[in-house]
Amino acid sequence: MRFFFLLLPVLLASMVSFAQENPYFVTYDHHMEEPGNLDLEVSATTDVPRAGQKYYFAPWMEFEYGVTARWTTELYIEGQTTYGDSTVFTGWRLENRFRPMKREHWINPVLYLEYENLNEASRIQKEIVGGGSDVTSPNSELRNTSAHELETKLILSSDFHDWNVAENFIVEKNLSKGEGFEFGYAAGFYHQLATLASGEKCRLCRENFLAGVEFYGGLGSTLNFSGRNTGNYVAPVVSWLVSDNATLRFSPGFGLTHESSPVLFRFGYSYEIQGIGSSLSQLFGRKR
Amino acid sequence: MRRRSTFVACSLLVALVTMLGQNPEYRQDPKWSAPDDAARKVNPLATRPGATAGGKKLFLRNCAECHGNGSGIEKKHSADFLLPVVQDQSDGTIFWKITNGNTDRGMPSFSKLPEMERWQLVLYLRTLKPVPSPR
């Protein structure tokens, strides 16, 4: 086992991959993680609070692994710090995405299933359903209310003339208490700034940038189905292939309703490691 | 005489390394074939050889992980681009295979790359020299 930990940094350094992540923070498209690759990502959500609310910073970490070319699984760990209040661990999520169709089509569906073990202090707002997060109550109160939730999404995504267009329909059920089924949506589009790769190795070339816009928000629940009294945002998104193995993403989200924060800022850094699945299985004796 | 035998030994070694570096066991998936209209597509960059360098960069980013870096060393089940069974396919067929992938065999779709970048990949693949299959 000691041998494994000694070898791990060498293994990681030698397996750098070069794939660029899409720029969305909330919307999913139909592109899955490549089989055997592990994508490590650190991201955060913060906002400009309304009067009477407190500034918060909510980081999360993702471990995204391509099990097969049509199945991606992902583990999230998240927390948050509220200025003048406290720092708390807010829980974890395990998601799976399945792509039922083998080939590319005009519209490509993906089925999404996630289990969430969170408390009510969660602020990352990876998706917004129902009426959105409670950003007014103190952490000491919110962290004691745990929520076991099951979330499903229907992801529809198309690549059309070098544009990606994606729509997500979200249904979430809190298994811990009777809130009915909560609904939400996300949609977006993006484009690579240059569509022909230059022969030179460059970092600030347009080909290394993806830019677009996403829209997301809650749609109420079965108890109160409505777009009113929910958070809704429009958010420009941009990603930059900052080095051969890493992507930086940034998105300012602008609230469209009174229940939304005036501005949400999201940023993320992802680092992809290729072939980690097969390398680890070889390390433990499986033949290639 | 000695120089000649050294030359022959070196040539045999190079041939052996090339053959061993290839993936002669690679067999096309018979179910993985491009529709006729896709197979007939012509590479719009065929008259722009300057785009090949960008294709090489994209190849190293996206393909070399499984298919090797063009020297014929790759994962067991991945296509070896040096083999005639790959090089004999039309540009349109290779473009279609890059776009759609073969998800049952672990080849992901690369439709996330802009169309011109996928044609750049085809352009670069054509510069790889095919080696006859060992009988």
Q: Model-predicted segments: where are they?
A:
Chain A
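Transmembrane beta-barrel domains of Gram-negative outer membranes and organellar outer membranes
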Residues: A19-R288
